[in-house]
């Protein structure tokens, strides 16, 4: 019995075509996931930077003549209390003008709905579950560090993807008084 010569199948190359059809949506999906992760990373970096600056300012009296507002702004932007041309921003596009410091003595730019109603002489209450119906036992001062108007710029892999402006990123901590 004689075998017929090898015949090429009609399905030859079908896997390559299927792979090509699936590859582009998979690349777009993977890049989108990476871009979303990058946005979350930048948001968390800003949150941690405001926390560091609020912690730094919490040991200073707001009435101190050496109160380091500009150093705290540099701490948010550069991760260091000194601003310099050699420093790189923690996140691209962040400037010290986007950082607002609010406390008992500095209230410019502190009138947003997300801000506390007051920064000095906040009453503290007894052990009645911190309810305002308890007896006031003292007062504290707070300091707020806020990043306002930061715009996240996506990587240029998506030409149609628009930039995102984050909401106010705020940290409030108790301050010495």
Predicted regions and their residues:
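Short, conserved structural patches
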Residues: 2-3, 51-177
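Alpha-helical assembly-interface signal, strongest on the long, hydrophobic N-terminal helix that forms
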Residues: 2-78
């Amino acid at each position: 019995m004689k075998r017929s010569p090898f015949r090429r199948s009609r399905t030859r190359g079908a896997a390559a075509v299927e792979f090509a059809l699936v590859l582009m949506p998979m690349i777009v999906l993977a890049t989108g996931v990476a871009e979303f992760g990058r946005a979350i990373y930048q948001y968390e970096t800003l949150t941690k930077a405001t926390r560091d600056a609020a912690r730094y300012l919490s040991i200073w009296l707001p009435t101190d003549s050496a109160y380091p507002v500009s150093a705290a702004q540099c701490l948010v932007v550069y991760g260091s209390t000194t601003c310099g041309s050699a420093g790189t921003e923690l996140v691209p596009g962040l400037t010290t003008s986007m950082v607002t410091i609010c406390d008992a003595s500095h209230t410019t730019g502190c009138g947003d709905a997300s801000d506390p109603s007051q920064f000095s002489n906040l009453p503290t209450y007894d052990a009645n579950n911190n309810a305002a119906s308890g007896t006031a036992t003292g007062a504290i001062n707070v300091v707020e560090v806020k990043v306002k108007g930061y715009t996240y710029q996506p990587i240029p892999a998506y030409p149609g993807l628009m930039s995102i402006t984050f909401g106010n990123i705020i940290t409030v901590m108790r301050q010495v008084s």
